[in-house]
Amino acid sequence: MQSWRQQGSIWQLRPRQPQGLIEFIGGSYLAATPQVSYRRILEDLCDAGLAIHAWAYVPGFDHQSQAKEAWMAFRQSRRQLEDRSGVLPPPLRLGHSLGCKLHLLAPDGGRGSHGLVALSFNNFQADRSIPLLGELAPRLGVETEFSPSPQETLRLITRHYIQERNLVVRFGRDELDQSDDLLEALKKRGADNTEALQLPGDHLTPASAGLRRSLLGAWADDPKRVEVIRR
């Protein structure tokens, strides 16, 4: 397997003859270094013959703008890959937590993808995602919310997200998961082939074992949980 390379905001991992492409966006606190935070799951996908493009970013309040930024970065990297390896099938978009939301807000409405795998969809309000903000904002007399807001995000998904092929994955002990809200928004569309899958684990299950060891100790190396990560 080839080593990770960074091109702008995209971390790339490519087999010698890629059979397809994964475009990945991670979640808050993990997204700045996806090649580390999600190393295991992404390298396993590369071992299966898929090129990996992972967007590195620091989450902000304007999620609509960041969704466009990610989409444009992926498009540029995909063109460069196809110049080298030939035309590939449409990419599969893979997101974790906030990364799911950013994929769902992409300017093309999912049109340019083969489908979306949404791991642990998360769409909380800003004061829930950033606890300190919830304490300081009232004292400062300001109102701060993500753009689009959680409610508007779900409306935009129903109205503008056109990709029919979606797999919504939730983990049994994930207290941050809001997949039910996403499924409801997707099912309201005229055409939908979305499927749901529940697996054992929690919100950090998609993250690499190395990061999870630092957060959770030996618990992260439970063989059953490692198998879930590989699945």
Q: Model-derived features: where do they sit?
A:
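Short, surface-exposed "cap/lid" segments of acyl-processing enzymes
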Residues: 2-59
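The feature captures the conserved acid-bearing segment of alpha/beta-hydrolase catalytic domains
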Residues: 14-16, 115, 125-197
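Short hydrophobic segments within beta-strands
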Residues: 24-25, 94, 119, 169
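Short acidic, S/G/P-rich loop/turn micro-motifs used as interaction or catalytic elements
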Residues: 28-31, 59-60, 99-100, 123-126, ...
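Short low-complexity, flexible loop/linker segments enriched in glycine and/or proline
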Residues: 62, 66-71
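Serine-dependent carboxylesterase/thioesterase catalytic core
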Residues: 70-159
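Catalytic histidine neighborhood in serine/cysteine hydrolases
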Residues: 189-215
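Catalytic active-site module of serine/aspartate enzymes centered on a nucleophile-bearing elbow/loop
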Residues: 211-231
